[in-house]
């Protein structure tokens, strides 16, 4: 009886050791199939088979030792690219198709990433998406910068890109904040309108006034020039001045930008 009990205990001990060895081996195999990448300071953990899905690409070359890649301080492969955009690259490798969040506006940057990682399929899908966006008519948005007491005074900026209108609006608000400790009641900001207390015309140009003490942001002419320069830098073109009777753009009441 005692011999049977001892024998069973030895069998259990052997089974436990055997299972531990198997678990350890499975753990090693699991780790060997995973890979941690440091892309521009962002860590991504994925399977090697995901990175090698498409042959003759940058990531496949790293996994199979065809391409030498530096390591970071923690021993992870370091790739000096856009860490935020890499998630879209990785999702393309996982899904085999391009899936982007609504309102994604970084097609050109993503196209550069696709080119760097040598993913022709991704590059083609990004290009196709960009071309479709260009063909899709975009609703024109506007920003009106007016006098609280006279809506006929001021400037209207029209554009077919809402994000650019927001950029100009943010710039005006930022400059205005730099002139004041806080916004007075006389200064009104809404979705499409920025209203100043007064537009005062002088020899130096129309001044955008905020407070009773005549603190002003800038001249209206300066604002027009800055809006035009911002638009050109962002790849827009000045379609026309909507009020051509004024002659010079500086004297126009409205500007229309298009991309």
From Swiss-Prot:
A Pfam family: KCTD4_C
GO biological process, one term: protein homooligomerization
InterPro entries: BTB/POZ_dom (IPR000210), KCTD4_C (IPR045740), SKP1/BTB/POZ_sf (IPR011333), T1-type_BTB (IPR003131)
Domain BTB: 33-134
PANTHER family, alphabetized: BTB_POZ DOMAIN-CONTAINING PROTEIN KCTD4, POTASSIUM CHANNEL TETRAMERIZATION DOMAIN-CONTAINING
Protein known as: BTB/POZ domain-containing protein KCTD4
Gene: Kctd4
């Amino acid at each position: 009886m005692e011999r049977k009990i001892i024998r069973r205990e030895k069998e259990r001990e052997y089974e436990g050791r055997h299972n531990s060895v198997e678990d350890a081996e499975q753990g090693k195999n699991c780790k060997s199939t995973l890979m941690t990448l440091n892309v521009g300071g962002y860590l991504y953990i994925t399977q090697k088979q995901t990175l090698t899905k498409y042959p003759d690409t940058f990531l496949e070359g790293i996994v199979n030792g065809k391409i030498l890649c530096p390591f970071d301080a923690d021993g992870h492969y370091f790739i000096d690219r856009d860490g935020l955009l890499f998630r879209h690259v990785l999702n393309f490798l996982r899904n085999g198709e391009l899936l982007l969040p609504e309102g994604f506006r970084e097609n050109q940057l993503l196209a550069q990433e696709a080119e760097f990682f040598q993913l022709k399929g991704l590059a083609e899908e990004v290009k196709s998406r960009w071309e479709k966006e260009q063909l899709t008519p975009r609703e024109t948005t506007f920003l009106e910068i007016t006098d609280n007491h006279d809506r006929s005074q001021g400037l209207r900026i029209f554009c077919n890109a809402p994000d650019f209108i927001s950029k100009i609006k943010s710039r005006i608000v930022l400059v205005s904040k730099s002139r004041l400790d806080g916004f007075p009641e006389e200064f009104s900001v809404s979705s499409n309108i920025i209203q100043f207390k007064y537009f005062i015309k002088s020899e130096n140009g129309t001044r955008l006034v905020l407070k009773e003490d005549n603190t002003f942001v800038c001249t209206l002419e300066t604002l027009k020039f800055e809006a035009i320069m911002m638009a050109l830098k962002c790849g827009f073109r000045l379609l026309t001045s909507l009020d051509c009777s004024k002659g010079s753009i500086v004297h126009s009441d409205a500007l229309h930008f298009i991309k």
